[in-house]
A protein has these predicted regions:
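Short Gly/Thr/Asp-enriched flexible loops that form oxyanion-binding sites at enzyme active sites
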Residues: 84-92, 159
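Gly/Ser/Thr-rich loops at beta-strand to alpha-helix junctions
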Residues: 78-84, 151
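PRPP-dependent phosphoribosyltransferase catalytic core
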Residues: 19-24, 156-204
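Conserved acidic residues
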Residues: 72, 140, 170
Length: 204
């Protein structure tokens, strides 16, 4: 369903003004109205936010687990996928899961770090895990999670982290694939999130 939407993108933040347009998304049988947010004058995207939505988190975790390949550990890049990562670990009975941080943290016993250059922006993305966690995933099958796959940059950086730590990428999963990302044949997702025109219609 479309409503009148006003949304602005500044840096890494979306600024939304009421009234706003939404897009009704069916996520493996559960429906949510996603606000449409402006990225450029001719491009709007649907804002899928799993934070704070317990029903959505539990539902998506269960549906992804039904489709998941065999794995030993779950790993996700921070931060939007954290609720999903936790809930999938909880539902599967896992004792632990791993989070790739954007920088070193004081609690880490040591730092295992990778730097991956972005294909689209040429910037360098840093991902970090504790060296103790890196040791645990060595030789193990690691299932990589994210909330939405769009450019795939976060996914590629996380894959490189797993490989450099000596782990095996068991699979790549997300709730949604945005835009052309749905054409990737090496990902498992629950649905396709289209891109939008300024009037709220789906881009061809």
């Amino acid at each position: 369903m479309l409503y009148n939407v006003k949304c602005y993108f500044i840096g890494y933040y979306f600024i939304k003004e009421d009234p706003f347009m939404t897009y009704e998304m069916d996520i493996a049988g559960l429906k949510r109205d996603l606000p449409l947010c402006k990225v450029t004058d001719d491009l709007y995207i649907g804002a899928f936010v799993i934070f704070g939505d317990v029903e959505l988190t539990v539902h998506c975790a269960a549906e992804l687990l039904k489709r998941a390949p065999e794995y030993d550990y779950l790993l996700a890049p921070e931060a939007k996928s954290i609720p999903l990562l936790y809930e999938m670990a909880r539902q599967s009975g896992a004792d632990e899961y791993f989070l790739a941080r954007k920088g070193p943290k004081a609690y880490m016993s040591g730092v295992f770090e990778v730097n991956v250059k972005s294909i689209t922006t040429m910037s360098v993305q840093k991902l970090v895990i504790d060296t103790a966690d890196a040791e645990k995933i060595k030789g193990k099958r690691v299932l990589i999670l994210d909330d939405v796959i769009s450019t795939g940059e976060s996914l590629r950086a996380t894959e490189e982290l797993v490989r450099q730590a000596g782990g095996i990428v068991a699979g790549r999963m997300a709730v949604l694939a945005e835009g052309d990302a749905i054409n990737q044949d090496d990902i498992i997702v629950l649905g396709h999130l289209p891109l939008f025109n300024p009037d709220g219609t789906v881009k061809a």
